[in-house]
C-alpha cells in the first residue's frame, strides 16, 4: 500500500508540474509570414524540460516513420520536403504520437539537404508529441491570451556560471573517490582515535605488546603501540581524580573524530619509507661509483649461432667469436676501411695507380653505356638525336634519282639590274606584242 501511495504522489507531482505554463525564459520568437512573430520552444529546451519533469530515465522517443515528400534540383541546388512521425513514451506505458515536417531550400550539397530536412522533421515531431502532455511542455504556446500577457513579463538572462561546467577534473575526482572507497572496504575498519581515561594512562602493561599486522596492496607492516612511561608512585591527587570520574569519560567517542592516521602509524610509515630510500640510495651510489672508476661491462661480438649460448651464459668456442677488424689476405687493401676520409692523389701515386680518369670516362656514353671498339679514346662518341618515324616523314621529303646523282649547278637568271635611283624600267620581251 505504501508503494501505491508513493507512486500516486509521484504522478500528482508530475501532473502539477505539467499544469504550469512556461516562463519567458523558455519561449523564443521568430518572424513568421508577413510581419507577424511566432512564439515557439527550441528543441533542446523541450528535452531539458522533459528530463526535469519525467526524469532522465522516465521517458523515451521512437521514430515511427520518415517520408521524403519531394526532391527538386535546379541549377545544382536541392530543395527537399520531409515528414516524420515520432512517439514519446513514459515509463508507465503512456505515450503521445504526432507528425512533424521539415524543409530545406537551395542547398548546394545533396547529403546536407537530406540531413537538415530529416533532423528538422524529427525535432518538430518530437516537440509536437511532448506538447500533448501539458502546458509545461509547450501546449501553452497556442494560447493567444497567454502570449499577449507573457510578453510584458520581464526577466534577467541567467549569468554564466563557470563552476557549473562539467570538466574532466570532475570525472577524475569521481574516479579517485570510488577507488578510495574500494580501498577502504578492502582494508577493513579504519583506525579511529579514542580518548584514553586516566585508568588506561596509569595502567601498567602486564604482558609485552602484541604485534598487529595491516595489509595494504599486498604489503604487510608491523605496528607496535607506543609505550607509555608510568611512574612507580602515584600522587594522592591522581587517585582521587580516578575515583571521581565522570560517566561521560567512559563513553567511547571514537565516531566523533576523523579517520586520520595515528602518530605511531606515521612513525612506522616514515621508518619504512626511510629504509626504502636508503636501499635506493645505496644502489644508486654503487652505480655511480662503478661509473666513476671506469668499469665498463664487457661487449663481445659473436656469430648468430653462438648468440643463444651467450644468452644462456654458456662458454663460447673460439671459432664463434667475431672479429670486426679482420682483413682477408686474398683481397688487396689499398684504402683504410676503418676511417672515412677522401682518397688523395698522392696515395694513388704511392700505390702505383693512375689518378687520371679521363680515359676511363671516355669509354662510356653519357648514360653509362659502354661504347663500341671502333671509337677511339681521343674522340668521344656523341650520340645523335633520334627522331621518330612520323617526324622524319614530315621533315624529310622523298628524293628522286636525279637528286640522288649529285648536286647540280643552279641556272643563272639574268634579270633587270638597277643602275639608277627611282622606279625600274620594264624591259620589252620579244614574245610580247604591242597592242595599240
Swiss-Prot record:
Q: What is its main location?
A: nucleus
Give positions of region: Disordered. 180-252, 367-436
Recorded hits in InterPro entries, A to Z, give: DNA_recomb/repair_Rad52, Rad52_fam, Rad52_Rad59_Rad22, Rad52_Rad59_Rad22_sf
Does the record bear Transcription in its keywords? no
Q: Which GO terms describe its biological process?
A: DNA recombinase assembly; double-strand break repair via single-strand annealing; mitotic recombination
Source organism, top-level taxon: Eukaryota
Give one GO molecular function term: DNA binding
Which controlled-vocabulary keywords does the entry list?
A: DNA damage, DNA recombination, DNA repair, DNA-binding, Nucleus
Q: Which family does it belong to?
A: Belongs to the RAD52 family.
State what this protein does: Involved in DNA double-strand break (DSB) repair and recombination. Promotes the annealing of complementary single-stranded DNA and by stimulation of the RAD51 recombinase.
Q: Which PANTHER family match?
A: DNA REPAIR AND RECOMBINATION PROTEIN RAD52, RAD59, DNA REPAIR PROTEIN RAD52 HOMOLOG
Subunit structure of this chain's protein: Part of a complex that includes RAD51, RAD52 and RAD59.
Record protein name field: DNA repair and recombination protein RAD52
Q: Which organism is it from?
A: Kluyveromyces lactis (strain ATCC 8585 / CBS 2359 / DSM 70799 / NBRC 1267 / NRRL Y-1140 / WM37)
